[in-house]
Amino acid sequence: MAQSVLKTVIARYKTILENQNEWIKPSFKKPQYDLVWNRDYSLTQNCFSINTLNGRVKLSYFSDGMSKYFDYTIYKFGTARLVNKHGKYYLHIPVTYEVEESNISDICNVVGIDRGINFVVATYDSKHKSGFVSGKAIKLKRANYSKLRKELQMRHTPSSRRRLKAIGQRENRWMQDINHQVSKALVENNPKHTLFVLEDLSGIRNATERVKTKDRYVSVSWSFYDLEQKLIYKAKQNQSSVIKVDPRYTSQCCPCCGHIEKSNRNKKIHLFTCKKCGYKSNDDRIGAMNLYRMGINYLANSQVPNTVVAE
């Protein structure tokens, strides 16, 4: 137990040093305990055996919807974290298992995925089918969260600060659930050995900070990275792969004739009209089509600049 405490404190200091511009003294307000599998905790006879200062205790548990992960022949338990939340104890257990890696030669389907705000994702696949997940309801709900947050910030009371924190956590959980649903649908609606092609949005925060102030909250805080990470690990589970490519000109290039021009895209009405061949379509769909084309080029060993294979 002493070793677990030491490692937790060191990890918190490292996080502060890596993420903060100035030094902030770490605080530990919520009780937590990191447990190493087979040393600090184990699972026997449908009970968890947990090491404490007063010896090992056996505890019954509830695992609704998670029972499949308790098959030791498939899943391997990692270092768990015991936390107390609203008077109840939760054991967060990371599990790992081996999956077959997907080889490029096995790829049978390519899906270009354009991420955005009006549409969470727009897709285009090898069957030349397009798909859209609307972001309208998400934008509306996040706007309501933002309005409520501003009202609470003006009160400057202990209760308003507590509620602010709770609202932030609730919004984060809700957005993570949305990303889980979207990434799960993308993987399940496509066969094994699919290549998903995303834009490399590493610099998205710097770009979105140049938008109008009234739109900045939505643009900067949109969880593109979280969706990306969830898609990567779900794709691996389905023997599929994810690559990230240079996003330049994906919304300005005509997928039919290859003509690139900034005025091809009308952002206000979300319409792409090629000035050369006249091809018209939704601008997000155009982005997905161009990402699909870059995926095909990648498989054909053609030069696709700045391609990153997601790990």
Report residues per predicted region.
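Nucleic-acid substrate recognition interfaces
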Residues: 1-311
